Amino acid sequence: MGTKLTLSTLSNGIRSTLTATRGGLNRAGQSLTQAGQTLKNGAKKIILYIPKDYKYDSGSGNGLQDLVKAAEELGIEVQKEEGNDIAKAQTSLGTIQNVLGLTERGIVLSAPQLDKLLQKNKVGQALGSSESIAQNFSQAKTVLSGVQSILGSVLAGMDLDEALQNESDQLTLAKAGLELTNSLIENIANSVQTLDAFSEQISQFGSKLQNVKGLGALGDKLKNIGGLDKAGLGLDVISGLLSGATAALVLADKDASTAKKVGAGFELANQVVGNITKAVSSYILAQRVAAGLSSTGPVAALIASTVALAISPLSFAGIADKFDRAKSLENYAERFKKLGYEGDSLLAEYQHGTGTIDASVTAINTALAAIAGGVSAAAAGSVVASPIALLVSGITGVISTILQYSKQAMFEHVANKIHNKIVEWEKNNGGKNYFENGYDARYLANLQDNMKFLLNLNKELQAERVIAITQQQWDSNIGDLAGISRLGEKVLSGKAYVDAFEEGQHLKADKLVQLDSAKGIIDVSNTGEAKTQHILFRTPLLTPGTEKRERVQTGKYEYITKLHINRVDSWQIKDGAASSTFDLTNVVQRIGVELDHAENVIKTKETKIVATLGDGDDNVFVGSGTTEIDGGEGYDRVHYSRGNYGALTIDATKETEQGSYTVNRFVESGKALHEVTSTHTALVGNREEKIEYRHSNNQHHAGYYTKDTLKAVEEIIGTSHNDIFKGSKFNDAFNGGDGVDTIDGNDGNDRLFGGKGDDIIDGGNGDDFIDGGKGNDLLHGGKGDDIFVHRQGDGNDSITESEGNDKLSFSDSNLKDLTFEKVNHHLVITNTKQEKVTIQNWFREAEFAKTIRNYVATRDDKIEEIIGQNGERITSKQVDELIEKGKGKIDKSDLSQVVDNYQLLKYSRDASNSLDKLISSASAFTSSNDSRNVLASPTSMLDPSLSSIQFARAA
């Protein structure tokens, strides 16, 4: 036999059939286990071993010479020892030494030990004398031809697979199943030759089958098995085996339910194992009685319990799951077939094919294990039956092992068909990558599923054009197919796609957008007539670069396809004239190059983003890594408010160009979007295929620093952390966002927003707009004409002012609903929500002047105007007068009077403006010397600061 075996299952199979036996069988199990372990290194043949100096007498009738002749006829090597070059197995049973040996060269039958055994253990015709047993070895070539005949089972299994794959009719399926059963019958007959029970029943059954179309060959085989006497064993065995074939066909039925298939597994176990157990056990118990041995209940129970150990319905449930997997894959595949991809259907074909093989081999192994277990258990305590039990166990174990090895070949046969179909498809489609075609189909299906949502994005995002970029990431089905077909070197980790939408219509984006994942280019500058656009990264976009894979063998059946990435260090983003919004938080910038045992990132690499925005009022939401932004023309904002990528530290005090900032961030330990490399595993029987691929995941990391460079940026929005902003000498616009932020406008006319949190804001020099937002904020205006804003729900703010013509706007409160009172040196203003705005040291200078002789005021800590939501206002002078009048608190009636007077003044202004317009219109109808032209226009009392106040209200 030229087939190299892997007998890892032999040791397990023999061990499982012997563990329930007693006494000497324990030592037999140890011996065979050791032998099986040795044979794992590679048994290649059957060897009849004859020691160098062993003498035997051909005339003694012991049959050894016949055995040698039988081996030679079968082409089995007869090895006469020239040295100690064959490692023999250890003790098998007490008085039996090295009858059956398993070595690294092959399966060794020890001629002298077999000879001694046959001479020593002579029994009556019930079991056959040693001479007749030896004669049977030579005539029927029992043990040797039994091992060889298993090849028939392998071929039959492949025939069954082919029949199922070709969807043949039920008769052909039945024939293939019975051919498989027939091969098993031959193996059993050869393995238990001393059971003289098959002849008449098998012959009769064979004659009947000869009359059935398509089954004549099987009938011939059954009919012509001769040399056996009448007994009641045969029909039970045959019926059990046929039930097994039927169950195997049920397991192979792609339309059968899981419950039905699991039931078929139990049926197989009950019918095959049950009938065989009954027949074999009853026969051997009868032989024990004939030999004068015990046939008590415990012996029968031992036989039954040992056989029960060989039954594993769970294995059939596993097979049923395989067919269910095939069925679900086929259903899943239907949609993608319509999109031009049949990979899922190929996977279903593989699962169905290998499931058929599993069903066939499991049926055979179940029967073999039951027979071996029954014979071994029946032999307990009987020296006479020991050699038969040993040989039956050994040979059935070898058969099972050969089947398992052959099953791998059959699995590979199915996998090769898948491989060939993929290669043929690529050949017929101009060399296109089959697996890339799979990603294309996945993308198209996703696009179809989400089209309604995508078509509504123009409205939702308020953009004339929406650019949607979708990254199809690793697909496990595609990975399975690549591994099974041995084409892992061709598979991709994924593929990126781009779509465009305008006015609720889907456009082909290839002429509008350039997306090059290999070079790292995203160009959306061709905006056409669109004035606004939104660039949406629907799924995490993997880092740019190209992939290359290399498949290497790491073990006998183990392979790994290594991933090599030629990375590009940055994404280059180019925008045009439209006002665009980019959300970069879904662009993967962090690469986990080293992970610990818990999958935490301990070493990273970064891919930066370089964005050139062009014209338009653009918004950029920054992601997890280094970002360089040139805002170009227009009012451009950079947002750090999405994601969780560390607090900002901005120091622009030394910047020489307006809109230039360096933003430092420290991202504390936690989870962040990373690109990592993982391994996909696909199994083809014993063959294990590992394929490395990259994908995005929120990985835990130890923290990292990153630095952003901003140019021509008009406004920066902070994070949810505690940010620090230090402005330039130019006009800055900062929004702290959430967190406890520290914002210093420095020079320039700055717009400073605290956002949520208890912020500290200093306007510095210049006419600043300061909005503390929610939280208890500390606000300082500094020099210049500053505007402060407070809203209901903003909390309790404290304001410090020194110089300039400053204003405080309560943008959603009526002035007369506020409460003004003096608390120590401070003015405290309370709104209807009992939130307080404290203007520090409002009364300090005046009190010093009252108490200190000749004191000259050096500071003005007051706010010159306090304004309500409708523009009504009260001046600092009016506040002082009414506080003094009310003895520390402004009376509500006095405050209402101030508001009413302002409203009257406002109406007067409106009337004055209307009169101006009327006079201007009338003058067009008069001559230049008309006396009406000398009417004096009333002096406008409109405060030039109103435009600033209106801005404050709008804010």
Curated annotation (Swiss-Prot):
The keyword Secreted applies. Acylated by LktC. The toxin only becomes active when modified. InterPro entries: Hemolysin-typ_Ca-bd_CS, Hemolysn_Ca-bd, RTX_C, RTX_pore_form, RTX_toxin/Mannuronan_C5-epim, RTX_toxin_determinant-A, Serralysin-like_metalloprot_C. The chain crosses the membrane at residues 232-252, 299-319, 361-381, 383-403. It holds the Pfam family RTX. It is found in: Secreted; Host cell membrane. Its main location: secreted. GO terms for molecular function: calcium ion binding; channel activity; toxin activity. One of its GO terms (cellular component) is membrane. Signal peptide: none annotated. GO terms for biological process: killing of cells of another organism. It is a multi-pass membrane protein. Keywords: Calcium, Cytolysis, Hemolysis, Host cell membrane, Host membrane, Lipoprotein, Membrane, Repeat, Secreted, Toxin, Transmembrane, Transmembrane helix, Virulence. The transmembrane domains are believed to be involved in pore formation in target cells. Belongs to the RTX prokaryotic toxin (TC 1.C.11) family. The lktCABD operon has a complex mosaic structure that has been derived by extensive inter- and intraspecies horizontal DNA transfer and intragenic recombination events. Pasteurella leukotoxins are exotoxins that attack host leukocytes and especially polymorphonuclear cells, by causing cell rupture. The leukotoxin binds to the host LFA-1 integrin and induces a signaling cascade leading to many biological effects, including tyrosine phosphorylation of the CD18 tail, elevation of the intracellular Ca(2+) and lysis of the host cell. This leukotoxin is a major contributor to the pathogenesis of lung injury in ovine pneumonic pasteurellosis. It also has weak hemolytic activity. This is Leukotoxin.
